[in-house]
Amino acid sequence: MNSFPAQNLMLSATNANKDSGLRTSNAHWLHSCIAVPKTTGIDLSQEPPAEGVMVPQSHLFPPPIRDSRNDTETVKQKSVNQSPSKALKPKPQRKKRSVSNKSKKTPSIPETKREKKNLDINIDISSFDTSGVPPPVCSCTGVSRVCYKWGMGGWQSSCCTISISTYPLPMSTTRPGARLAGRKMSNGAYVKLLARLADEGYDLSHPLDLKNHWARHGTNKFVTIK
């Protein structure tokens, strides 16, 4: 008797297949006969896959691990986009600037009533005689000060400028040795003022106070002279 009956069965099966003319595969026999060590990590309890059967990739590779941080970030973005409270918040109204700063600025010159200039008045000053009229004065400091001659028959204040009112005027910082220039009135504006006051009944034998007749800025050259 043979002490290896399994080998005899394998030989008899292969010889029978050869005689019948069929091709055989010894993979199954080899798999069943070859001993696999336990250290290989292969689970022997599972049956080997049949020949020609595709094994799904889910059994070969583990499923990918999803990062929970991305899920939390997407949930936060959705909650931010879906919150209507931020989109419906009304814009805060801007506070209007108070006008108190302008009122706090007090000019050094006391405010006086200025006459309204009528630019449509045309006065013929060619026949108006100013030879007997005394030089004008300015009483912005409380005392009447005689004005200086300026230009071609014009007059300049000796005690006030647009911003200050004092006598004598302080020295100029831009022109060494000269004082600040006072307010000015051209000859045409002065003669026109005399003609208008004479029509109103003013006595031209007395010096004319130019305190309320100075121009607000610069000179009185805006009048029309004919």
UniProtKB/Swiss-Prot annotation:
Main location: nucleus
Tissue: Expressed in seedlings, leaves and pistils. Detected in anthers, in pollen grains, in young rosette, in leaf vasculature, in the lateral and primary roots, in embryo sac, and in the whole ovule.
Localisation per UniProt entry: Nucleus
SMART domains: GAGA_bind (SM01226)
A Gene Ontology cellular-component term: nucleus
Domain of life of the native organism: Eukaryota
Biased composition (Basic residues): 88-105
Pfam families tied to this protein: GAGA_bind
Annotated region (Disordered), positions in chain: 42-116
Keywords, ordered alphabetically: DNA-binding, Nucleus, Transcription, Transcription regulation
Function text: Transcriptional regulator that specifically binds to GA-rich elements (GAGA-repeats) present in regulatory sequences of genes involved in developmental processes.
Family: Belongs to the BBR/BPC family.
Protein name: Protein BASIC PENTACYSTEINE7
Organism: Arabidopsis thaliana
Gene: BPC7
